[in-house]
Regions:
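Mature catalytic core of soluble alpha/beta enzymes
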Residues: 1-313
């Protein structure tokens, strides 16, 4: 899936730690074979090759991720779209080559994208891609699923105090010895949060973007327009699992400001921190104005109100 993974754990013995870590990395490798769009032999790639054909039986893991992706698409009015892989690839190339995709390229990529072109059957556990050319991109949701499963594997080996990180997404188990939780930094907010049995994910255009004719385009594509995002925003989500955190963090960079609270209300006990850069940038990069979404979490009984209290506004 084109990502580095880091595991930190506490175990009774060195051998126990080694065995648990090996099992977790083996699980990650197994899931990479399912979800990767970089591998021609992955289950995802083989599904795409059968576009335009009959429904295809898929693994439980792939079905769960596809189903969650389609649900987020509905909840965001199509702003989050796992079927927009052709657009994602087009803008990857645009960033690499520092050029604007031409109208024909954009039109072609949008034509083969669309959630209506992916049909799922929960009873038969099948997926069907309608028409040729569609590419699935699970990069904004599968990472969270993978690190959740890695943490579950560690727990199965009696390792409960652990952290798993992949591409900026983090899940943590029980707190390290002598600590209230894992101390995690949110760089754009200038603060630290302390978490246990939780997940945190950050999404935004802080690193991957291209500037063309004075306009900055993000690597995150709005499938409704076909263009990389031009509004600058970085979102951090804290919730109980990485699967939810990963997808929601990306979704919050895509939806309109007025839609954020309604989206978060669909996920009880979720907290979010959304940053907007103050311009012009200073020599050390942007300073962010922060919007905190913590009220809904408190109302739903969260035991950690004020999680972002130390973050600058």
């Amino acid at each position: 899936m084109g990502m580095q993974v880091r595991i930190v754990l506490y175990a009774g013995t060195r051998d126990e730690a080694r065995q648990a870590a090996r099992a977790a990395f083996e699980e990650i490798a197994r899931l990479d074979w399912i979800f990767s769009d970089y591998r021609d032999d992955s289950e995802l790639s083989r599904l795409v090759l059968r576009a335009g054909q009959a429904p295809v039986p898929v693994s439980q893991e792939l079905y769960e991720v596809l189903d969650r992706g389609q649900r987020l698409a509905r909840q965001t009015g199509g702003a989050f779209d796992i079927t927009a892989g052709a657009l994602t690839r087009l803008w990857r190339g645009a960033i690499r080559d520092e050029r604007m995709p031409n109208e024909a390229e954009l039109r072609s990529a949008m034509h083969v994208s669309g959630t209506d072109k992916l049909r799922l059957d929960d009873t038969a556990q099948t997926a069907q891609i309608i028409g040729a050319g569609l590419r699935l991109d699970l990069g904004a949701i599968a990472k969270g699923y993978v690190i959740d499963q890695a943490l579950t594997t560690l727990r199965a080996h009696d390792v409960t105090k652990a952290l798993v990180e992949a591409g900026g997404d983090i899940v943590v188990g029980a707190a390290p010895p002598g600590e209230a939780g894992w101390h995690l930094t949110i760089p754009h907010a200038g603060c630290e949060v302390v978490l246990a049995e939780a997940a945190i994910s950050t999404s935004g255009d802080t690193e991957q973007f291209v500037e063309i004719e004075g306009i900055r385009y993000s690597h995150t594509v709005d499938p409704r327009t076909g263009f990389g995002l031009t509004h600058r925003r970085i979102a951090t989500v804290v919730v109980s699992d990485g699967f939810t955190a990963d997808g929601l963090a990306t979704a919050l960079t895509l939806v309109e400001d007025v839609e954020m609270e309604a989206l978060l209300d669909l996920y009880p006990r979720t907290r979010a921190l959304v940053g907007y850069p103050r311009l012009p940038e200073g020599p050390l990069g942007p300073d962010y104005y922060l919007r905190v979404y913590d009220e809904a979490s408190t109302q739903n009984g969260s035991n950690t109100p004020g999680l972002f209290a130390g973050c600058r506004r």
